[in-house]
Amino acid sequence: MDVPLELSAYTRVLRLASTPSWEEFSQIAKIAGAGILLIGAIGFLVFLIMGGIVSVI
């Protein structure tokens, strides 16, 4: 494990990385938010279905 070699690789990646523009950040935030809402809706539907099945039994 060569620490200086790993640190140089990390610094190289950080030098190449750039901050996203506002439009790019906004698009990523919208997509991530939609994904979170979709997963939450699926979980809520499963909760409702399982609650209905348990109440019938």
From Swiss-Prot:
GO terms for cellular component: plasma membrane. It is found in: Cell membrane. The chain crosses the membrane at residues 34-54. One of its GO terms (molecular function) is protein transmembrane transporter activity. Component of the Sec protein translocase complex. Heterotrimer consisting of SecY (alpha), SecG (beta) and SecE (gamma) subunits. The heterotrimers can form oligomers, although 1 heterotrimer is thought to be able to translocate proteins. Interacts with the ribosome. May interact with SecDF, and other proteins may be involved. Its main location: membrane. Belongs to the SecE/SEC61-gamma family. This is Protein translocase subunit SecE. The keyword Oxidoreductase does not apply. GO terms for biological process: intracellular protein transmembrane transport; protein secretion; protein targeting. InterPro entries: Prot_translocase_SecE_dom_sf, Translocase_Sec61-g, Translocase_SecE/Sec61-g. It is a single-pass membrane protein. The keyword Secreted does not apply. Keywords: Cell membrane, Membrane, Protein transport, Translocation, Transmembrane, Transmembrane helix, Transport.
